C-alpha cells in the first residue's frame, strides 16, 4: 500500500440517523475502490463495519468503524458512525479527528431529530458538512420534501450539486449541475453512462447550475469578480469556491445516491477527491496550551488516540490520527498522559475487520496499533522531546442510569473488571461503585446503550448480570435552629469514659453573619467565638463549625474529636441515611472529667448531640434536580409536555427550532428513571433530550413521608 502525504488524505465521518444507510454507503465506496472484492449488507450480517457479534445481533452499528478506500491516487479514510442516539459517543469520537462530515439522510424519513442532533455536534466541532440523500430507489422516496426540510433546518447554505430525475422504484438517473451531465445506471449500478441533459430537464438544470455558481462565487472575492466579469465560472473555479465554502461552513453541498444499488457512489467519491478538503487544507489540531499543530510531515511525530476496541484474540486495538510527523513501525512513543513509553510494534491501515500492515503513516492519516500497555482514548503519543498534548474528547452527560449486579455473587469482581474495560472502549459508558448508595451504578446514553453492553457481557464474557433500580443520592438538611446536649458516660471498673457536649445547629446560608446570640433555655446567650472551621463537603454543601467554649469547660484538644463525631453523623444523616449538608454548628458548653475524658468520649457525645439537634431542627430531604432539554417534533409536543408534568417537572420555557420544539424543564432525578425509553415510546423514537445536574431542592412533604416510610421499612428488615 502506498504511503500518503497530508494533501492526499481525506478524513471523513459518515454520520446520520439510524437506518440512513451509512454502512451500506461505506461498503459501496470500499468496493468501488477495490479494498473489498464484494459488497456486504447489513441484512446479511457481512459488512466490514458491523463485524462484532453485538452489532450483528442488533442489526445496528454500536462502535465507530475506521475504514479506508483508495481513489484517484488519494486515500479516503472513513469513520462509519452509529446512528442510534444511544451511541452518540462514537459520533463525537469520529468528529474529533475527521476533516469533513458526510451527513447521510434517508430520502423516505427526511431530516430527523437525529440529523438535527448530530449536526449540532458537527457545528460545535466546526467541521465542513456534505449532505448525501440516500435510498432514492425506495418507493416512498421524497427528494423534494427531504431537501425542503434540510433547507428549513440549515438555511441557504444547503446547495444542490445533484438531483434525481426518476426517484422511487426504477430510480437510475441523476442530473449533476456542477458537471452539467446526466448519469444513467444499469440495474447493477457501478459505473454510469454519461449522457447530455435532456431537454425536459434543461431549464431546471440551468437554474440550479447558476445557483451553484453564485454560491461558489460568494466564498471567494476573486471568484466573485470573475463571475461578474464573465457571467459564469469554470468547473475548476466552481470546485475552488465550493471547497472554500465547505471549509468555512458557508456551504453544505447536496448529493443523491442509492448506496444499496451502488448508484452515484463513484461520482460522490470523485467529488470527495476533487473538492473535500484534505488534511493539509485544514488548520491542524490545537494543543491544551493553545498551540496550533499543522498536519505536516516534517514535524515531530505526534498522534492522538480517538478510539479503542478490545478483541478476543488481539486485545486492545488503539485507533489514532497522526497529527504531526511520521509514525513508523517499531517507534517508541511517550504517552503524555501517563509518561510511559509505548512501542508501536505493529502498524495498520484499517478497513473495519480487515487490517493491512503498513510500515509508516504520515501526518493527517488514520491508523491503528495493538498491544499498547496503558493507552486510552484521548491520549497523546509523542516522540521523545515533543511536548504536544491534545485535549481529551468531551462526551455528553449520561441520560440513563441503572444499578447492576452479578447473578452469581462469585462473579462480582470479574463483572466489575469487565465493566471498567468496557468504559475504556466506550467512555460515554460510566461505571462507578457508589459508597454512598452501596450499589454499582452504570450510566449511559439510553436503555439500548446499556442493553447492548449487557448482551456483550453475557455472551462474550459468560457472566450473567441483572439490572435493578438505582437508589437516588438524596441529601438531608435542616430548616431552623435547634439546641441539644448529650453526656456520654461509661464506667467499667478501670478508667471510664466521660464527655458532655452542648451545641446549637442552624441552616447555613452563603454570606450569613457570624453568630452572636442564641436563645438557650429561653434566655439570650451571647457567643464568644474562639475558633472557626469551614468545610466544603465532598458530597456538596458546607459545614461551618464554631468553638464558642468559655472558661475551658472543654479543652481545645477535644474539639477535633467533637467535629469528627459530627462529620461521621453527616455521612449518614438521621432521616434516611443520606449525606447531610449546609449546617452551622456552635459548641458553646460542656463538661470534662479530669481522668475519664478522652477523644472517643467527646466524639460520641458530639455525634449524639448533633443527631438529637438535627431531628428537632425541621429536617428536610433534598433531591437532585436536573436541567432537561427535550427536542421533539411539533406534533408530539403536547404528549411530551403532558408526560413531563406527571414527572413533577417545572417547565422553564419552550423554543421553536426548525420544525421541532425545544422544551426546557427542571426535573427530579427520581422522575427521570427510564425517561429515554418513555420518550422514545411517546414519539416513535423521533425525540431526544439532554440532562445536566442543576442542584438540590427540598422534596414535597408527601414525597418526604414516602421516603421516610420506605427507609424505616428497610431499617426494620435489616
Describe each PLM feature range.
Residues 1-718:
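Structural and coupling elements of P-loop NTPases
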Amino acid at each position: 500500500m502506498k504511503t500518503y502525504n497530508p494533501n492526499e488524505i481525506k478524513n471523513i465521518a459518515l454520520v446520520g440517523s439510524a437506518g440512513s444507510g451509512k454502512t451500506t454507503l461505506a461498503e459501496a465506496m470500499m468496493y468501488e475502490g477495490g479494498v473489498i472484492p464484494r459488497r456486504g449488507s447489513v441484512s446479511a450480517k457481512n459488512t466490514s463495519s458491523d463485524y462484532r457479534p453485538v452489532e450483528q445481533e442488533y442489526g445496528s452499528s454500536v462502535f465507530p468503524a475506521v475504514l479506508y478506500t483508495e481513489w484517484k491516487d488519494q486515500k479516503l479514510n472513513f469513520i462509519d458512525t452509529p446512528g442510534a442516539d444511544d451511541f452518540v459517543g462514537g459520533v463525537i469520537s469520529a468528529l474529533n479527528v475527521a476533516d469533513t462530515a458526510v451527513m447521510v439522510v434517508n430520502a423516505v424519513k427526511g431530516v430527523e431529530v437525529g440529523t438535527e442532533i448530530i449536526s449540532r455536534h458537527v457545528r460545535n466541532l466546526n467541521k465542513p458538512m456534505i449532505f448525501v440523500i440516500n435510498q432514492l430507489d425506495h418507493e416512498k422516496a421524497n427528494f423534494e420534501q427531504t431537501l425542503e426540510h434540510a433547507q428549513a433546518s440549515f438555511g441557504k447554505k444547503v446547495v444542490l450539486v445533484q438531483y434525481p430525475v426518476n426517484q422511487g422504484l426504477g430510480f437510475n438517473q441523476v442530473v449533476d449541475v456542477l458537471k452539467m451531465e446526466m448519469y444513467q445506471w444499469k440495474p447493477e449500478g457501478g459505473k454510469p453512462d454519461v449522457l447530455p441533459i435532456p431537454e425536459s430537464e434543461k431549464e431546471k438544470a440551468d437554474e440550479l447550475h447558476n445557483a451553484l455558481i453564485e454560491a461558489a462565487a460568494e466564498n471567494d472575492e476573486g471568484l466573485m469578480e470573475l463571475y461578474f466579469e464573465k457571467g459564469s465560472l469554470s468547473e475548476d473555479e466552481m470546485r475552488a469556491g465550493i471547497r472554500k465554502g465547505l471549509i468555512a461552513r458557508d456551504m453544505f453541498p447536496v448529493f443523491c445516491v442509492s448506496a444499496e444499488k451502488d448508484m452515484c457512489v463513484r461520482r460522490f467519491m470523485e467529488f470527495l477527491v476533487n473538492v473535500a478538503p484534505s488534511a493539509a487544507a485544514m488548520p491542524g489540531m490545537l494543543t491544551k496550551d493553545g498551540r496550533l499543530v499543522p498536519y505536516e510531515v516534517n514535524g515531530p511525530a505526534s498522534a492522538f488516540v480517538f478510539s479503542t476496541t478490545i478483541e478476543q484474540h488481539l486485545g486492545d486495538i488503539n485507533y489514532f490520527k497522526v497529527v504531526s510527523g511520521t509514525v513508523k513501525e517499531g517507534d517508541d512513543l511517550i504517552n503524555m498522559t501517563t509518561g510511559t513509553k509505548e512501542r508501536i510494534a505493529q502498524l495498520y491501515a484499517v478497513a473495519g475487520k480487515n487490517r493491512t500492515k503498513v510500515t509508516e503513516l504520515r501526518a493527517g492519516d488514520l491508523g491503528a496499533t495493538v498491544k499498547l500497555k496503558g493507552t486510552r482514548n484521548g491520549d497523546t503519543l509523542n516522540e521523545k522531546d515533543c511536548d504536544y498534548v491534545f485535549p481529551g474528547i468531551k462526551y455528553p452527560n449520561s441520560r440513563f442510569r441503572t444499578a447492576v449486579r452479578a447473578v452469581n455473587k462469585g462473579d462480582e469482581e470479574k463483572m466489575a473488571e469487565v465493566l471498567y474495560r468496557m468504559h475504556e472502549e466506550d467512555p460515554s459508558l460510566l461505571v462507578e461503585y457508589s459508597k454512598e448508595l452501596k450499589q454499582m451504578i452504570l450510566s449511559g446514553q439510553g436503555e439500548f446503550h446499556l442493553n447492548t453492553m449487557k448482551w456483550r457481557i453475557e455472551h462474550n464474557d459468560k457472566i450473567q448480570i441483572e439490572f435493578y433500580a438505582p437508589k437516588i443520592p438524596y441529601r438531608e438538611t435542616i430548616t431552623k435552629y435547634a439546641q441539644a446536649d448529650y453526656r456520654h458516660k461509661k464506667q467499667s471498673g478501670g478508667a471510664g469514659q466521660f464527655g458532655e457536649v452542648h451545641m446549637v445547629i442552624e441552616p447555613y446560608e452563603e454570606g450569613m453573619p457570624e453568630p452572636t446570640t442564641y436563645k438557650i433555655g429561653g434566655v439570650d446567650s451571647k457567643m464568644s467565638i474562639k475558633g472557626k472551621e469551614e468545610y466544603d463537603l465532598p458530597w456538596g454543601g458546607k459545614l461551618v463549625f464554631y468553638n464558642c467554649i468559655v472558661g475551658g469547660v472543654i479543652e481545645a484538644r477535644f474539639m477535633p474529636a467533637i467535629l469528627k463525631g459530627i462529620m461521621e453523623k453527616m455521612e449518614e444523616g438521621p432521616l434516611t441515611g443520606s449525606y447531610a449538608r449546609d449546617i452551622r454548628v456552635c459548641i458553646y458548653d460542656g463538661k470534662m472529667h479530669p481522668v475519664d475524658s478522652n477523644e472517643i468520649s467527646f466524639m460520641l457525645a458530639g455525634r449524639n448531640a448533633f443527631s438529637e439537634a438535627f431531628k428537632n431542627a425541621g429536617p428536610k430531604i433534598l433531591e437532585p434536580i436536573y436541567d432537561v432539554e427535550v427536542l421533539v417534533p411539533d406534533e408530539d409536543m403536547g404528549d411530551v409536555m403532558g408526560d413531563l408534568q406527571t414527572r413533577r417537572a417545572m417547565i422553564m420555557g419552550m423554543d421553536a427550532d426548525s420544525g421541532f420544539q425545544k422544551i426546557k424543564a427542571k426535573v427530579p432525578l427520581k422522575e427521570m428513571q427510564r425517561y429515554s425509553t418513555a420518550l422514545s415510546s411517546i414519539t416513535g423514537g423521533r425525540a431526544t433530550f439532554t440532562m445536566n445536574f442543576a442542584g438540590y431542592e427540598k422534596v414535597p412533604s408527601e414525597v418526604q413521608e414516602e421516603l421516610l416510610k420506605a427507609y424505616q421499612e428497610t431499617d426494620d428488615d435489616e
